[in-house]
Regions:
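A structural signal for multi-pass alpha-helical bundles of membrane permease subunits
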Residues: 4-345
Length: 345
C-alpha cells in the first residue's frame, strides 16, 4: 500500500494494468481452459466417404474416415462433460488397487500403467540430477573465481557453451557420440574388444539422459554461483585467514551461508524445468523405452488412426504435472518463507 499512497491510484493502475492483462491472457486464461478441458471429452465427429485415388497406373476407389463438417466448413465436435473420468483413465486407481491387493507393491506390475512408469522416470530424473548440478556448478564457480583475471573470460565462455546449445541439438550430439558406430562407442568397443549397444536397453539410455541434463544445466548453476561469489564480504575472508580457518571451513561457514538463497533459487528453477522433461526423450529417440509426464501430454495430442486427439486426457495430464511441480516445491518454499520471516524479526 506504500507505493499506492505515493502516487495516484489511476497512475498506479496505468503502470500495472499492462502486466496484469498479460498475466490474465497468457497465464490465467489458458490455465482455466486447460482445467475445463480436463473434465471434458473432446472428439471430432467422423464419417466414412468413398474417395477416388489415382496414380500413373490407373484409379481406384477407397473408403476413408474423415471429420464431419458443418455448413461453414468447420469440424463438428463431440464435447461431453465427463467429470473426473479423464483423470481416472490416466491414474487407473482400480487397476492399481488390484495389483497391490494381489501382488503387493510389485513395481514390475505397477509400471505396466503408463502414468506410474512416466512418474517414476520424471521423479528419478528430477531428483538425481539436482545434487550433481548444484555441486558441480559450485565447484566450477570456486575454481574459476580462483583463476587469474586473464583466464577468467575465456574459461567462463567455454563453460557456458553447453547451456547455450539448443536442448534438442545438444541431446542429438550426445546421442551421435554413442549410437551405433559413434566415436565414443567405437572407442569403447576397441578398448573392451566387444560389441556395445548402449541404445538397446532403457537403463543405459536413462543414464545418458541424466548425464546430458547435468552437462547442459550445470553452466546455469555455475554462472549464478560465480556472480554470487563476487559479493562475498572480503573482510570476512581475510579475517578467516587470520583465525587460521582452512578452505573447507571458509566454504562451510562463510561462502555457503552467503549464497544459500541462490542455491535455493537454482534448485527451484531446476525442479520446475526437470519435472517437465521432454527434450531428452525427443533427442535420444527414447519414447520406445522411456516416457515422462510431459511426453504423455504430447502423446495424447498426436493424431490416432481415426484422426482424433485425446485433448481431455492431455489436459488432465498437464494438470497432474502442474500439481506434481507444486508438491515438490512446497518444502523449499516453506523453508524460504520461514527464513525470510526470521530475518525480518
Amino acid at each position: 500500500m506504500g507505493v499506492i499512497n505515493l502516487m495516484k491510484k489511476s497512475t498506479f493502475l496505468v503502470f500495472t494494468m499492462p502486466s496484469f492483462l498479460m498475466m490474465v491472457f497468457f497465464i490465467a486464461a489458458p490455465l482455466l481452459i486447460v482445467i475445463v478441458q480436463s473434465f471434458q471429452f473432446n472428439q471430432d465427429v467422423l464419417h466414412t466417404i468413398e474417395r477416388e485415388k489415382c496414380d500413373p497406373f490407373g484409379c481406384k476407389t477407397e473408403i476413408v474416415t474423415v471429420p464431419l463438417l458443418d455448413t461453414d466448413g468447420r469440424k463438428i465436435k463431440n464435447n461431453q462433460w465427463v467429470g473426473f473420468q479423464n483423470y481416472s483413465n490416466i491414474l487407473k486407481f482400480d487397476q492399481l488397487s488390484n495389483i497391490i491387493s494381489e501382488k503387493g507393491f510389485s513395481w514390475k506390475d505397477i509400471r505396466s500403467i503408463d502414468f506410474y512408469k512416466a512418474l517414476r522416470f520424471t521423479l528419478t530424473f528430477t531428483f538425481l540430477t539436482l545434487p550433481f548440478i548444484l555441486i558441480l556448478g559450485l565447484c566450477l564457480a570456486l575454481c574459476v573465481n580462483a583463476l587469474v583475471n586473464k583466464l577468467k573470460g575465456p574459461v567462463i565462455f567455454i563453460t557456458l557453451l553447453p547451456f547455450i546449445i539448443t536442448p534438442v541439438i545438444g541431446a542429438l550430439s550426445i546421442k551421435w557420440l554413442f549410437i551405433g558406430d559413434g566415436i565414443l562407442t567405437s572407442f569403447l568397443e576397441y578398448l573392451l574388444d566387444k560389441d556395445i549397444a548402449i541404445f538397446s536397453s532403457s537403463w543405459s539410455i536413462e543414464i545418458l539422459m541424466l548425464f546430458y541434463r547435468v552437462w547442459h544445466t550445470t553452466p546455469f548453476a555455475f554462472v549464478i554461483f560465480y556472480a554470487a561469489l563476487q559479493t562475498v564480504d572480503k573482510e570476512k575472508i581475510e579475517a578467516s585467514f587470520v583465525d587460521g580457518a582452512n578452505r573447507f571451513q571458509r566454504l562451510r561457514y562463510i561462502i555457503i551461508p552467503h549464497i544459500l538463497p541462490l542455491i535455493v533459487f537454482v534448485s527451484l528453477i531446476h525442479l520446475m524445468d526437470a519435472y517437465r522433461v521432454f527434450d531428452e526423450i525427443v533427442g535420444f529417440s527414447a519414447s520406445g523405452y522411456i516416457t515422462s509426464l510431459q511426453w504423455m501430454t504430447y502423446d495424447y495430442l498426436k493424431l490416432d488412426d481415426a484422426g482424433n486427439r485425446y485433448i481431455g486426457r492431455a489436459s488432465a495430464t498437464s494438470i497432474l504435472t502442474m500439481i506434481g511441480i507444486v508438491i515438490i516445491l512446497i518444502p523449499i518454499l516453506k523453508k524460504t518463507f520461514k527464513d525470510q520471516k526470521e530475518r525480518q524479526q
